[in-house]
């Protein structure tokens, strides 16, 4: 009945170490309280013996010391029990820790086995080869897509272009020379660079001076006619 409630025999065995650890700790705590009580009784009986001695009552002092000895004997046995329980608790805790560690490692091994169950070195190598092939295929496709379209017939030869350009230049030079010869002299003169001519400037100055003298002469004649 209890096995069915707690999950069977395996689950019960799994809970035994924890239950034992709990019970041992509880009993050690109980003995610790008993130890403190005995130590208090020993101190109290010793104080009683001192008190009776100061009063001169050796009989009562002796009885107090006897009780003290009894408590001391009980304390020795109790402390021995506590030592045994603590050693047992330490051993069970260590064993339980080892058990839990082994269970965890077993679960890890089972998980790794499950993961590797569908794998072997041949399959891994085969898969890696397939991946490499697909990567290479992808690179080839990328290179093919990146190449320019309409190559071959429409490809331009740079050397041929240079030769054609030289021929056009040779044909154009005589035509330019003929056009320059056919231009009127006035246009040719305009096309020539301006050269400063000092003689032309001097004659222009003389003409301007003569025009100024004529203006002054006409002005004087007008003044004379007006009687000014």
UniProtKB/Swiss-Prot annotation:
Required for the sorting and concentration of proteins resulting in the entry of these proteins into the invaginating vesicles of the multivesicular body (MVB). Also required for the proteolytic cleavage of the transcription factor RIM101 in response to alkaline ambient pH. Residues 188-197 have a biased composition (Polar residues). The keyword Cytoplasm applies. Keywords: Cytoplasm, Endosome, Membrane. GO terms for cellular component: cytoplasmic side of plasma membrane; cytosol; ESCRT III complex; multivesicular body. The lineage of its organism: Eukaryota, Fungi, Dikarya, Ascomycota, Saccharomycotina. Residues 171-228 are annotated as: Disordered. It comes from the Eukaryota. It is found in: Cytoplasm; Endosome membrane. GO terms for molecular function: identical protein binding. Pfam families: Snf7 (PF03357). Its main location: cytoplasm. It is a peripheral membrane protein. This is Vacuolar-sorting protein SNF7. Residues 217-228 have a biased composition (Basic and acidic residues). Belongs to the SNF7 family. A component of the endosomal sorting required for transport complex III (ESCRT-III). InterPro entries: Snf7_fam. GO terms for biological process: ATP export; intralumenal vesicle formation; peroxisome organization; protein transport to vacuole involved in ubiquitin-dependent protein catabolic process via the multivesicular body sorting pathway; reticulophagy. Transmembrane segments: none annotated.
């Amino acid at each position: 009945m209890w096995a069915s409630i707690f999950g069977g025999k395996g689950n019960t065995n799994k809970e035994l170490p924890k239950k034992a650890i709990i019970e041992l700790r509880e009993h050690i705590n109980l003995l610790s309280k008993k130890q403190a009580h005995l130590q208090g009784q020993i101190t109290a009986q010793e104080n009683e013996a001192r008190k009776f001695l100061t009063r001169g009552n050796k009989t009562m002092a002796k009885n107090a010391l006897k009780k003290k000895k009894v408590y001391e004997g009980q304390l020795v046995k109790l402390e021995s029990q506590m030592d045994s329980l603590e050693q047992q608790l330490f051993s069970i805790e260590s064993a339980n820790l080892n058990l839990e560690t082994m269970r965890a490692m077993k679960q890890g091994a089972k998980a790794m086995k499950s993961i590797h169950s569908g794998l072997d070195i041949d399959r891994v190598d085969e898969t890696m080869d397939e991946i490499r092939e697909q990567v290479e295929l992808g690179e080839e496709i990328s290179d093919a897509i990146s190449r320019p379209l309409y190559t071959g017939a429409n490809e331009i030869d740079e050397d041929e272009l240079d030769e054609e350009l030289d021929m056009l230049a040779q044909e154009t030079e005589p035509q330019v020379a003929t056009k320059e010869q056919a231009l009127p002299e006035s246009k040719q003169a305009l096309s020539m660079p301006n050269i400063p001519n000092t003689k032309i400037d001097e004659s222009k100055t003389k003409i301007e001076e003569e025009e100024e003298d004529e203006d002054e002469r006409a002005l004087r004649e007008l003044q004379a006619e007006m009687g000014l």
